[in-house]
Swiss-Prot record:
Protein name: Small ribosomal subunit protein uS14
Source organism phylogeny: Bacteria, Pseudomonadati, Elusimicrobiota, Elusimicrobia, Elusimicrobiales
Subunit structure: Part of the 30S ribosomal subunit. Contacts proteins S3 and S10.
Entry's family note: Belongs to the universal ribosomal protein uS14 family. Zinc-binding uS14 subfamily.
PROSITE patterns: RIBOSOMAL_S14
Required cofactor(s): Zn(2+)
GO biological process: translation
Details of cofactor binding: Binds 1 zinc ion per subunit.
Length: 61
């Protein structure tokens, strides 16, 4: 519930640009954020395994 409140609060125009914090577009998680994808590490892994992110493959060496 706190995540939804935070997302709603951030939707309003902010007085200062410094207050903006990157959050996952799917679940709203603030930590483990990948800027290239706009997702947190958990959602990125889940979506990559499902094949929803083009060009991302599981590495093996």
């Amino acid at each position: 519930m706190a995540t939804k409140a935070w997302v709603a609060k951030m939707a309003k125009p902010q007085k200062f640009a410094v207050r903006y914090h990157n959050r996952c577009q799917v679940c709203g998680r603030p930590r483990g954020y990948y800027r290239d994808f706009g997702l947190c590490r958990i959602c990125l892994r889940k979506m990559a395994h499902q094949g929803l992110i083009p060009g991302v493959r599981k590495s093996s060496w």
